[in-house]
């Protein structure tokens, strides 16, 4: 089967690796243009491009996909199937109509829940216990096409978005492999999505990470997990922005403390009151320094019990 693969970030790599390993004919890889990255704003290649170059696969990086030129380019590649995994652009119907087997997408949620750009993060932020992978036929909407295969994975209480991302990326490759086998032997069933059950996972920005200490300890902990490694949860301490990398839930009991109050300072972390319950902050980072444990931070900085975070 001749495939054009479309993907951009690390999430897409295991699926592309699987296609190469299983000896599918990958005619080309389509990925987003190179972009400035990091503090130095040096131009960086998408991870999928790096993999394609190492494996001698043609790379296309269109700035727009809704152009006659791009449609013509895909048509000239004569794919039997398009495969997408976190490509980052919605494909026009003209492109989807080119391959005889259509377009299969690898999505990081159990559709119709968490349609959109950041399903992994929002599943954790919202406190889900289970998520998974759905392969689906792509249509012109945003993750609205017929579902094909699903696989579930449990989300542990302390799992971060980064950890879940890596597990789902690998699971996605396995589900894609099974999907392609069923396409080849004509045993694949299409399941329309119950659109009335759809929920959405919009793209994250840095403001999402702002901790509201009036929320429950569980909600605060979920936000910290769901924004690790990006954009990272944060609060303010003595007027300085403080990133909060790692927390744990100490208890979920009612109390009379002002939310955000530091109740205890110790080598195990900062115990902080939330709207309901308390969390322990274990790892922090200030703009001028590296990420560090609270034990490391309090060795060189005085942190007082009774001080209030978020100010």
Swiss-Prot record:
Which keywords has UniProt assigned to this entry?
Protein biosynthesis, Transferase
SUPFAM superfamilies tied to this protein: FMT C-terminal domain-like, Formyltransferase
Q: Which organism is it from?
A: Acetivibrio thermocellus (strain ATCC 27405 / DSM 1237 / JCM 9322 / NBRC 103400 / NCIMB 10682 / NRRL B-4536 / VPI 7372)
Function, in words: Attaches a formyl group to the free amino group of methionyl-tRNA(fMet). The formyl group appears to play a dual role in the initiator identity of N-formylmethionyl-tRNA by promoting its recognition by IF2 and preventing the misappropriation of this tRNA by the elongation apparatus.
What does the entry list as the binding residues for (6S)-5,6,7,8-tetrahydrofolate? 109-112
Q: Which GO terms describe its cellular component?
A: cytosol
* Protein name from the UniProt record: Methionyl-tRNA formyltransferase
> What family name appears in the similarity comment?
Belongs to the Fmt family.
Please give one Pfam family short name.
Formyl_trans_N
Lineage of the species this protein comes from: Bacteria, Bacillati, Bacillota, Clostridia, Eubacteriales
Q: Which PANTHER family match?
A: METHIONYL-TRNA FORMYLTRANSFERASE, METHIONYL-TRNA FORMYLTRANSFERASE, MITOCHONDRIAL
- Top class in the EC scheme: transferase
